[in-house]
Amino acid sequence: GNCSLRGSYAGGFRAPTLKEMYMNFDMASIFMIYGNPDLKPETSHNFSLSAEYMKGRYNLTVTGFYNIVDNRITTAWSEALKGQVYTNISNIKISGAEANASAKYPCGLSARLSYAYTHENIKKGQPVISSTRPHTATVRLEYDKHWKNYAFNVALNGRFLSKVNTEEYTSNTSYEETEKVTYPAYTMWKLTLSQKVWKGVDMTLAVDNLFNYVPSRYY
């Protein structure tokens, strides 16, 4: 088999928008959102290392990453202005890993499985308001067959998202009042059937949410 190793670095830069610097907006007469002309640009440093292995019809890739974001632009409550104001927050560190495996067979059958883990490093004392789910996984099973004037394809896609523990603000006038909440894990499935009945004529039937998943709460 063939094995390869890659490393990369990328730097990011985002200047504050005119909206973030100068907008004054009435949020449904509940509170005001104010721009901040003193905002600093967001910068980021992104590191990744990946390994790939290929042998015949099989492929495996593993990637690790570490990202640092400085001066992230967000909103915070201003007691002086009695409203929210755009501001910069201290650096955020995000790390994680991804794994992808795939196989393709001569009979037309193929499969792909992927998994990702993400961790956001929150400084002690700061509320954990991220809704990023730490574990996600996807799976795809596909059968594809071609003839002279006809082609047939059926694919089953599934996506799993783990539960996430986070905090929600409980007050419109304070960024110190939060409550801990847990959003449950769930899985979604989609089935797609495609047929090429003639040159330039395709028919596709798709069923989203195959098993009729309904969340216990909306957020």
Model-derived features with residue positions:
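Outer-membrane beta-barrel translocator domains and adjoining extracellular loop/strand segments
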Residues: 19-24, 31-32, 72-80, 118-128, ...
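C-terminal beta-signal and adjacent terminal beta-strands/loops
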Residues: 14, 70, 160-170, 194-219
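Outer-membrane beta-barrel signature, preferentially recognizing the C-terminal barrel domain
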Residues: 2, 11-69, 79-104, 131-135, ...
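Repeated loop/turn-to-beta-strand initiation elements of outer-membrane beta-barrel proteins
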Residues: 2-5, 57-60, 107-111, 147-153, ...
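Gram-negative outer-membrane beta-barrel transporters
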Residues: 65-69, 86-167
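Transmembrane beta-barrel domains of outer membrane proteins
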Residues: 10, 50-54, 100-104, 114, ...
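Hydrophobic alpha-helical packing residues
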Residues: 5-7, 18, 141
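Short, glycine/charged-rich beta-strand-loop motifs at protein surfaces that mediate ligand recognition
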Residues: 3, 63, 174-183, 189-194, ...
